Amino acid sequence: MAATLFVTCVTAVHADCLTDAQAAELLAHYVARTPAPNPVNLSDADGACTRGKFNQLLAQRMGKVVGYKAGLTNPAVQKRFNTDKPVWGKLYEGMVLPSGASVEAAFGARALYEADMLVRVKSAAINQAKTPEEVLDAIDQVIPFIELPDLMVQAPPQLNGAGVTAINVGARLGVAGTPLPVPVYRGERYALLKALADMNVSLTDGAGARLGGGKGSDILEHPLNAVVWLAGALQKEGITLQPGDLVSLGSFSALLPPKAGLSVTATYDGLPGAAPVRVTFK
């Protein structure tokens, strides 16, 4: 009797995976760009289950998966969401726009922007990568990227890691710059590896005023560690990275709200050959 009562009490404060109807409601809010109710008290398993249902519905609408995003890879951002580990979501066709794109400031219900970076997978060996060096061997491009996530719920500050997972880590849009090819020669590759950790990433407005930024090593001590983590997390759910997939590494900056008329440029100082990437909000 006491045991039964205990189980009842525990489950009363613990939410479950969103129902199919709730997942459909989440999609309706996503499409309408209106804030959805916050998922409450989700466990990590509930968050993953909800992400699966939400992505099934997103795929019917958005089409092909073009890659994945690792989120909460920066300890400062983890702290904001009261968690100590990264999360992941799927990127769909049409989400990645070219540098210079003009985007509505209200592109989502809870629109934000951040300094990020993409890499492109060259080889399935990436799924066994355990170090940044091994990741570099399995990618062929490093791409400057301003991500435009949408936290899409009524009260984003109340989201925890599982809640962020449930909403597909806020994947909505992003603006990609000119790809930087990964060099062939060993010495140049080593220099690139070091530059990725040491680079200073800055966000500036149209007048050149600094909006935010951070260092390469702010992401899991080396940004390519985000790929090591992501590959392992995906494999736990039976997914492997494939050649051509894009991977978003996470945020080098705080998440900032856009406003109409603002132009934002991300620069990667200390990363030779990396051109700035720009987005304008209308």
Give a label for each model feature.
Residues 10-15:
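Sec/Tat signal peptide C-region and signal peptidase I cleavage site
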Residues 1-9:
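Bacterial N-terminal signal peptides
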Residues 16-222, 275-277, 282:
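Catalytic-core "active-site belt" of small-molecule-metabolizing enzymes
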Residues 253-256, 270-273:
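Short, charged beta-turn/beta-strand-edge "cap" motif at the junction between a beta-strand
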